[in-house]
A protein has these predicted regions:
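Short, low-complexity disordered leader/linker segments with a strong preference
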Residues: 1-36
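Extracytoplasmic small-molecule ligand-binding "clamshell" domains
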Residues: 34-118
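Bilobed "Venus flytrap"/periplasmic-binding protein-like clamshell domains
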Residues: 43-46, 70-86, 118, 140-192, ...
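Acidic, polar ligand-binding/catalytic clefts
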Residues: 82, 91-158
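Alpha-to-beta junction loops
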Residues: 90-91, 108-116, 163-164, 201-210
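Extracytoplasmic/secreted cell-surface and envelope-processing proteins
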Residues: 103-104, 123-125, 151-152, 174-178, ...
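Extracellular/periplasmic Venus flytrap/periplasmic-binding protein
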Residues: 188-190, 197-203
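Single conserved hydrophobic/aromatic residue that forms the stacking wall/gate
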Residues: 216-226
């Protein structure tokens, strides 16, 4: 049984620079007169977006070739971006960008939009335009199944334990570390996979992340984490 120690709902949206509108952005493709919608993804955040070697998905659909890196991108957000591009009559271009710098690229005009689990915050709202939310997710704390924390059901039980906490760099998850009493700030990582690996290797005691991401990213969530 997985313990949902942090039960907080946040929303995810498409994000564009305030200097651009989705219907007004884009450039002409070099191969056709069709306009291009450039969207950046982390491409390492399953099930929302990930990288694979071939375009084959297995459901009759096709993954999208990544413009600035090897491989193809697919996932819920990639499919959603493709539908938006299709509705606008644009060609979709996918860019693979590390999370820690993805919003900076949006600001400098490297691409038109970001769709990679970006959550609304008042601070981000000062710089970026957010679409209507397309997903609500639950933030949880995940620990090793064989750790002393595995049977905890309340955050108050962590008081005085000096629990080492990790999450993704520069995300809205970071402030939730303060919700764990007596938590010790451990190293944060670029990807969710690295966060889970830190818990598996006992470099950290708990990762704070999205519950759905846990189901897809944890090496073996049913057996190893709670």
């Amino acid at each position: 049984m997985k313990k949902k120690l942090l039960s907080l709902m946040v929303i995810m949206s498409l994000v564009v620079s305030m200097t651009l509108g989705v219907t007004g952005c884009g450039s002409k493709s070099s191969d056709s007169d069709k306009k291009v919608l450039k969207v950046a993804f982390e491409c390492a955040y399953a099930p929302y977006n990930w990288t694979q070697e071939s375009p084959e998905v297995g459901n009759g659909k096709q993954a999208v070739k990544i413009k600035n890196a090897d491989g193809y991108a697919y996932g819920y957000e990639v499919e959603l971006a493709q539908r938006i591009a299709d509705e606008l009559g644009y060609e979709l271009e996918v860019y693979k960008i590390e999370w820690s710098s993805i919003l900076m690229g949006l600001q400098d005009g490297s691409y038109d939009a970001v769709m990679t689990g970006v959550c609304y915050s008042p601070e981000r709202d000062e710089t970026y335009d957010f679409s209507t939310p397309y997903y609500k997710r639950q933030i949880v704390g995940v620990v090793r199944a064989d750790s002393e924390y595995a049977n905890y059901t309340k955050l108050s039980q962590f008081a005085g334990k000096n629990t080492k906490l990790t999450t993704q760099i520069a995300t809205n998850y970071v402030p939730y570390k303060d919700e764990v009493p007596g938590g010790v700030i451990a190293t944060d990582y670029e990807t969710s996979s690295e966060c889970f690996l830190a818990v598996q290797n006992k470099t950290a005691d708990m990762v704070i992340l999205d519950y759905t991401c846990l189901l897809y990213t944890s090496p073996s969530p049913r057996d190893r984490t709670r």
